[in-house]
Amino acid sequence: NKKSNQQNVGIIKSSNLCTEIIEYSDDKEYAVCNLASIALPKFIKQTHTSDQLVVYTKNNCSWCVMVKLFLDKQNISYREIEIQHISQLAPHNHKTVPFVYNETQNIPVGGYEDTVQTYCNTIDHDALFECVCILTMNLNKIIDINHYPVPETKRSNMRHRPIGLGVQGLADVFMALQISFTSPIARQINKDIFETIYYASLYTSHQLATVDGPYETFFGSPISKGRFQFDLWGKDFKSTR
């Protein structure tokens, strides 16, 4: 309840069976929600480059094979130089293989992890933002035209106009980006995705409220006082974007 946006309505005593919604209910209104699921792999954007790369390798090097497989998968052209001794990398101030060098820009890329981070696929946040805006408008419309089996559910929906946006395929995204599930970069990507979703939904909700007015129980809620969901966690959150 400390993190509820319905603190002005009453105490929430339970969730639904799947626990994906936490809303207020009483004998006069039964909480329901209008949900949509976003398939995150649809928003993977492949990285393209026309730069010419040089991949320094040596015989019987598994990481050398892996970096070449990665570049092939990304459709990035390169030429391979198989070195006989590590001293051949001295001009580049590097002592391990594989080593990738960007000839076009005349700069070093680095080893396998550096190459993956530089040329891996990314999340198209602009497309995700646009999708969430559309979903928010659609879910808002569903509230008005939906079939309600009992009047208590309709009363709840009309008073609070709740919507929920979830995701699927986050693990698939990490696989496509070749990122460890528990790595710091995976955690940041996760935060960035939901930051985009939250912002886009709030932005569209504001646009709708400008035309239709706020929902009935808006005034007195945390959001009506400028307290967003991340403000209710008792922690400092700083966006890096």
Please place each PLM-identified region on the residue numbering.
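Internal maturation/activation junctions in enzymes
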Residues: C131-K154, M158, P162, S180-R241
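Function-dense linear segments that define catalytic or interfacial modules
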Residues: N1-S50, C120-R155, G169-V173
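Local sequence-structure signature of Cys/Sec-based thiol-disulfide redox active-site neighborhoods
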Residues: H48-I81
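Non-catalytic, surface beta->alpha helical segment in thiol-disulfide oxidoreductase systems
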Residues: E103-Y119
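Hydrophobic/aromatic-rich, well-ordered segments within soluble, folded domains that form packed cores
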Residues: P162-S180
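Conserved beta-strand scaffold positions in the cores of enzyme catalytic domains, especially
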Residues: L35, Y78-E80, P108
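Surface-exposed charge patches
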Residues: L69, K73, D172, Q207
